[in-house]
Curated annotation (Swiss-Prot):
A GO molecular-function descriptor: protein kinase C binding
Protein name: Caveolae-associated protein 3
Function of the molecule: Regulates the traffic and/or budding of caveolae. Plays a role in caveola formation in a tissue-specific manner. Required for the formation of caveolae in smooth muscle but not in the lung and heart endothelial cells. Regulates the equilibrium between cell surface-associated and cell surface-dissociated caveolae by promoting the rapid release of caveolae from the cell surface. Plays a role in the regulation of the circadian clock. Modulates the period length and phase of circadian gene expression and also regulates expression and interaction of the core clock components PER1/2 and CRY1/2.
Organism name: Bos taurus (Bovine)
PANTHER family: CAVEOLAE-ASSOCIATED PROTEIN 3, CAVIN
Broad class of the protein's primary localization: cytoplasm
Annotated InterPro entries: Cavin_fam
Amino acid sequence: MGESALESGPVPGAPAGGPVHAVTVVTLLEKLATMLETLRERQGGLAQRQGGLAGSVRRIQSNLGALSRSHDTTSNTLAQLLAKAERVGSHADAAQERAVRRAAQVQRLEANHGLLVARGKLHVLLFKEEAEIPAKAFQKAPEPLGPVELGPQLPEAEAEESSDEEEPVESRARRLRRTGLEKVQSLRRALSGRKGHAAPTPTPVKPPRLGPGRSAEGQWEAQPALESKLEPEPPQDTEEDPGRPGAAEAAAVLQVESAA
């Protein structure tokens, strides 16, 4: 059928109505075969290119997935960093407030220090014992004359201690005052004990006057009796309490009577 169709059609270059040669037919078939082969080759190349494009598309898709995952992790890390930055900012604000308060406290302390230095009342005590007492406090104080005269002597002793020591610290002044009061109380107790145990001062007894009818012998007999009465009484210890006003007078009266 093909040959008849080819034969029926006019061949270019051939005379009209003339027979068609087989050589032309073969050449045409060869051309057609070559064209088909080239077409197939091109289709194969296109298929290979399409496969390469599909692989590249798949690679691009995988890369896009990895990029999206990395973007998610980056967003999470950024969120954590922002939270940490907020916490650090809050801590920095709190630290700044504390620094401002400390600066204000330091300024107040500096102002107080300047005032104390200006007044001259700043003294640093490295070590002070609680029971420390000045050396003058251990000196033997004169025995007081009486309970009435203890009052004015106490402020004088405290004034001397304060003037000698010149300690502006209140605690030291309180300790000194307390020790002074304790010493005064102990002295009072000792004096009260001495007065309670000591014998009362004897009242001087004057000998009775002899009348005109008495003889001289009776007078000399009465005087030894008076002396015997006065001898057992011990003399008062004037050395222990020299300031008592009645002791010296009583001793003088006793000496005069014994001499008489």
